[in-house]
């Protein structure tokens, strides 16, 4: 995997920096593990915009990824690594000894031909999935479940990882990359190692059109709008917002806490790091 700066053959190409991985499969995805994906353009069933700056983009098929890793005790061979347009991480196609194939998030250091396994008796090896009760304290892990059997929810994007800090009774303590320390049940599964494609955040898109290919629409500044459209809008000529930065609906956008899920507050041992005061 390497960062490549392309030749400046046009203004749009001048700033492009791409991540090139020569080991990725160049053909089509495994046909039995893809399904149709309909675009919503950020709208709900009433046609109202619920997520701004989404729309258009190239058609994509969804790759069905195994986030549960519940095929225990059966060895799987890494058949190939593939690009996935739906996420920042790459995928690994596993071929189990009984012939079944599944996609998983590709961990760092995985190459075709390696043997992986899941289950409580799986060896402590990069890419293997085990319950947290069977993983040594201090290990770096990814694809962590938050509820047993629900499937991985934490540390799934490119370069992401979590550290297992401690185990106390039925719960393990995890340190997330944000600095938050969170409690998770020891029966939840996680995969050893960190997610691959860690250079994804170093790429440079280069031009606005490349963002449109990805289904990302422009973001208009509030101060460039009218007062009816945004709290920062209006004024004669170029003017400042005249207040602390807020969202279009008036919620402070700099350092204001918006978490409202009090039901799981007890699972957070320490909140994420903050530079605010």
UniProtKB/Swiss-Prot annotation:
Task: Return the annotated region ranges for Disordered.
Answer: 225-277
InterPro entries assigned: NA-bd_OB-fold (IPR012340), Rib_uL2_dom2 (IPR014722), Ribosomal_uL2 (IPR002171), Ribosomal_uL2_bac/org-type (IPR005880), Ribosomal_uL2_C (IPR022669), Ribosomal_uL2_CS (IPR022671), Ribosomal_uL2_dom3 (IPR014726), Ribosomal_uL2_RNA-bd_dom (IPR022666)
Gene Ontology cellular-component annotations? large ribosomal subunit
**Which Gene3D superfamilies does this UniProt record tie to the protein?**
2.30.30.30, Nucleic acid-binding proteins, Ribosomal protein L2, domain 3
Give a single Pfam family match.
Answer: Ribosomal_L2_C
Q: Which GO terms describe its biological process?
A: cytoplasmic translation
Q: Keyword set for this entry?
A: Ribonucleoprotein, Ribosomal protein, RNA-binding, rRNA-binding
Q: Does the keyword section mention Iron?
A: no
**Molecular-function annotations in GO:** rRNA binding; structural constituent of ribosome; transferase activity
Report the protein's function: One of the primary rRNA binding proteins. Required for association of the 30S and 50S subunits to form the 70S ribosome, for tRNA binding and peptide bond formation. It has been suggested to have peptidyltransferase activity; this is somewhat controversial. Makes several contacts with the 16S rRNA in the 70S ribosome.
Q: Which family does it belong to?
A: Belongs to the universal ribosomal protein uL2 family.
Subunit organization? Part of the 50S ribosomal subunit. Forms a bridge to the 30S subunit in the 70S ribosome.
Query: Do you know which PANTHER family this protein is assigned to?
Result: LARGE RIBOSOMAL SUBUNIT PROTEIN UL2M, RIBOSOMAL PROTEIN L2
Q: Which HAMAP family match?
A: Ribosomal_uL2_B
Indicate what this protein is called per its UniProt record: Large ribosomal subunit protein uL2
Q: Organism source for this protein?
A: Nitrosospira multiformis (strain ATCC 25196 / NCIMB 11849 / C 71)
């Amino acid at each position: 995997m390497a960062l490549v700066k392309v030749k400046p053959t046009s203004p749009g190409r001048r700033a492009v920096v791409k991540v090139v991985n020569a080991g990725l499969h160049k053909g089509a995805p495994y046909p039995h593990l893809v399904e149709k994906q309909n675009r919503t353009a950020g709208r709900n069933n009433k046609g109202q915009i619920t997520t701004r700056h989404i729309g258009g983009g190239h058609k994509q098929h969804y790759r069905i990824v195994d986030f549960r890793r519940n095929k225990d005790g059966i060895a799987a061979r890494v058949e190939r690594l593939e690009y996935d347009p739906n996420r920042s991480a790459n995928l690994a196609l596993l071929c189990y000894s009984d012939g079944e194939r599944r996609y998983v998030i590709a961990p760092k250091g995985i190459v075709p031909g390696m043997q992986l396994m899941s289950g409580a008796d799986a060896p402590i090896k990069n890419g293997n999935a085990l319950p947290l009760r069977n993983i040594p304290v201090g290990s770096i892990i990814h694809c962590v479940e938050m509820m047993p059997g629900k499937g991985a929810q934490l540390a799934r994007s490119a370069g992401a990882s979590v550290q297992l800090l401690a185990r106390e009774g039925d719960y393990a303590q995890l340190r997330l990359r944000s600095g938050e320390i969170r409690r998770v049940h020891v029966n939840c599964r996680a995969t050893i190692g960190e997610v691959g494609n860690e250079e994804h955040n170093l790429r440079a898109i280069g031009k606005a059109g490349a963002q449109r290919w990805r289904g990302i629409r422009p973001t208009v500044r509030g101060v460039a709008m009218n007062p009816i459209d945004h709290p920062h809008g209006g004024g004669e000529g170029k003017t400042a917002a005249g207040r602390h930065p807020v969202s279009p609906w008036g919620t402070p956008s700099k350092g204001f806490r918006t978490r409202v899920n009090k039901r799981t507050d007890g699972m957070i041992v320490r909140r994420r790091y903050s530079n605010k005061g």
